[in-house]
């Protein structure tokens, strides 16, 4: 999809979409519960479809009721899927559900998009060798076989918290006590707190023994619940960003007591509007693209903790460097930091590329509201925020969509 945006000012009120991070977690907990749960606030995004499809293939069942999903749970120890699970491009779906698949002694195959299967999976490969399980990768397929034992697990904390969260879902269902030791440095700790909150909502306890150790009692069971997904700070940031490029937008539907690490975006936006700050995004890497974009339109900034942006849906550092250059902005890039150096910010010199990355597309849309411009590959927003352009058009952003690719 190609979108042509003309310079326009956003004004009005917008409701934040449901939190993708929390929705994944609550759906998995519901599927692991005995009986029927209702999860309210589920979008029709690609990532939500991926998690629901994979849970269904493992043995759960679900029905959509408007923006809610009714889930009937299954026993993962009895799971024996006959066809590959399809996580599409969702890293959360794949990494959360591999340990769930390990709970049975049966073989499970995941078949994902090439961009997903290029993302690191070494942590699970190592754990399989250590625990006597199997893990094989062949092109776009990963095949695993358990069963998952209780015990001690050592996991690197600086690759992705998703590996740790995956174990947190599965280990409470094993027979004995387990310990997860996290090797520092620990990044994205806030995502582990989201996992703990989701588990707690369904009656499962995972406790911090210290800053680097999680203790998990075995023999626990998930209890069916009715829960509501809170608003998504990471996607709300793209709506709120219009306030920093001349707009006047009120974003509602966010919980002030949220555990989401991306809630820091408001403080970071204020810092960008007041100078040329140095900001650490190690605990909120999904904010990287929009922060780079606002820095380019403003006075610049330096961002640390950027290493993991290279292993997202795209290499987000390279993607933003490429696209911001079209606006006249240079990036100084090192292994774990990015400095945005604004020069003569101008109308993009050529069409912008979405890099098959929803957050790149939405960041470019915010900038194009200032300068105008064309974004190619804008369909990538379907991954997390399929109605993004409908929401921004309701705010007054002038966007013309065509089905050209």
Which sequence ranges carry the predicted segments?
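Short, structured segments at the rim of ligand-binding sites
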Residues: 1-405
